[in-house]
């Protein structure tokens, strides 16, 4: 029986794609200059994860093991193309901001990794839930990273939200503080590495605190047993 609570815990925290597996670092560090870009890329990746997991789970019994990886990549590429066309049609500003990193979702190790490790071995519903949780976990890291870098670098939050949500979302842009010039380090990849390292360190500290709160299991002393080899 599928343990959905464990799947959620693995995707959101214990085996988080960004903080634990360190997968998808290229778009994670390059695109997260603003919260809008981070959220847009996270949603796109999550949609591809869910779709690819479901489709691969449905065809897993019909694909020979020898060619499964090329077939998986073709399915993922088709879904990424569909998502790319949708973003191009309905969020063109975001499409231009994400640039090459949107089609590069095809090469994201998170997606092919979940296809091989989970979707190819489980039913469609469980695979969809796994894709959702892994996608949410990755999106949360993107959002935290994007929000932190935007606040430190520009002093704003959700700048350019209209590119993702439409003209009405301009009202969502929030000025945290007024800056005369942007903090360049936070907007460049070195700043992304620093913030990412701090997020990973924070997670490790929280994990350590959680382990310390867990009651220690008492170890039962082993009892030596006499072995009778001969009865006189």
Curated annotation (Swiss-Prot):
What is the annotated localization of this protein?
Cell inner membrane
Could you list this entry's UniProt keywords, alphabetically sorted: Cell inner membrane, Cell membrane, Electron transport, Membrane, Translocase, Transmembrane, Transmembrane helix, Transport
What is the uppermost EC class here?
A: translocase
Classify the protein's membrane topology as the record does. Multi-pass membrane protein
* GO cellular component terms attached to this protein's record: plasma membrane
What's one GO BP annotation on this UniProt entry? electron transport chain
Q: Which residues are the signal sequence here? A: none
Q: Where are the transmembrane segments?
A: 39-59, 69-89, 93-113, 128-148, 182-202
EC number(s) recorded for this UniProt protein: 7.-.-.-
What PANTHER family does this protein map onto? ELECTRON TRANSPORT COMPLEX PROTEIN RNFE (PTHR30586), ION-TRANSLOCATING OXIDOREDUCTASE COMPLEX SUBUNIT E (PTHR30586:SF0)
Q: Give the family, as the similarity comment puts it.
A: Belongs to the NqrDE/RnfAE family.
**SUBUNIT field:** The complex is composed of six subunits: RnfA, RnfB, RnfC, RnfD, RnfE and RnfG.
- Function, please? Part of a membrane-bound complex that couples electron transfer with translocation of ions across the membrane.
**What is the official name of this protein in its record?**
Ion-translocating oxidoreductase complex subunit E
Natural source organism? Shewanella oneidensis (strain ATCC 700550 / JCM 31522 / CIP 106686 / LMG 19005 / NCIMB 14063 / MR-1)
């Amino acid at each position: 029986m599928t343990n959905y609570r464990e799947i959620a815990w693995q995707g959101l925290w214990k085996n988080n794609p960004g903080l634990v597996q360190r997968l998808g670092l290229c778009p994670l560090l390059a695109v997260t200059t603003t919260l809008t870009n981070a959220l847009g890329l996270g949603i796109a990746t999550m949609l591809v994860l869910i779709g690819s997991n479901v489709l691969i789970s449905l065809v897993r019994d019909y694909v020979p093991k020898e060619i499964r990886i090329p077939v998986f990549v073709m399915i993922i590429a088709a879904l990424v193309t569909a998502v790319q066309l949708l973003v191009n049609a309905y969020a063109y500003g975001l499409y231009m901001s994400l640039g090459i990193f949107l089609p590069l979702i095809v090469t994201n190790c998170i997606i092919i990794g979940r296809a091989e490790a989970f979707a190819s071995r489980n039913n469609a519903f469980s695979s969809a839930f796994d894709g959702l949780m892994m996608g949410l976990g990755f999106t949360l890291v993107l959002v935290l990273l994007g929000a932190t870098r935007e606040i430190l670098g520009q002093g704003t939050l959700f700048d350019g939200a209209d590119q993702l949500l439409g003209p009405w979302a301009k009202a969502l842009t929030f000025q945290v503080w007024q800056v005369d010039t942007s903090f360049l380090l936070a907007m460049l990849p070195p700043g992304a590495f620093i913030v990412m390292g701090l997020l990973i360190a924070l997670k490790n500290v929280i994990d350590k605190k959680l382990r310390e709160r867990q009651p220690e299991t008492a170890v039962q002393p082993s009892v030596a047993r006499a072995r009778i080899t001969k009865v006189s």
